[in-house]
C-alpha cells in the first residue's frame, strides 16, 4: 500500500502471530522524533494486533511533510491502517 508519506508492505505467513518492521528515514527528523513516532506506531500495532493475525507488516516512513501537523500525520496513518484492516476482514 503506497501513500503520500509512507509505504506499507504486507504479506501473509503461516504463523498466527503478526509481526511489524519499522523503517524511518533520517529525513523524518532527529532521533528523538523518529523514536517517538516508532514507539507510537508500535503501540498502535500492539493494540490492534488481533486484527493482523498471520500478517507481516513493514512500514517505511519517508520524509515527514513540513506542512502537516503531527496529529494530522498520525490521523492519515490511522486511516490507512483502517483500509488495510478492511482488506483482510
Give the positions of each predicted feature.
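Positively charged, solvent-exposed patches that mediate nucleic-acid binding
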Residues: 1-89
Amino acid at each position: 500500500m503506497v501513500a503520500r508519506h509512507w509505504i506499507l508492505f504486507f504479506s501473509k505467513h503461516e504463523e498466527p502471530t503478526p509481526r511489524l518492521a519499522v523503517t524511518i528515514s533520517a529525513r523524518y527528523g532527529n532521533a528523538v522524533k523518529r523514536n517517538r513516532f516508532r514507539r507510537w506506531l508500535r503501540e498502535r500495532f500492539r493494540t490492534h494486533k488481533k486484527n493482523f493475525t498471520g500478517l507481516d507488516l513493514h512500514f517505511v516512513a519517508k520524509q515527514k511533510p513540513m506542512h502537516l501537523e503531527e496529529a494530522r500525520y498520525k490521523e492519515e496513518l490511522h486511516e490507512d491502517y483502517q483500509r488495510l484492516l478492511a482488506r483482510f476482514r
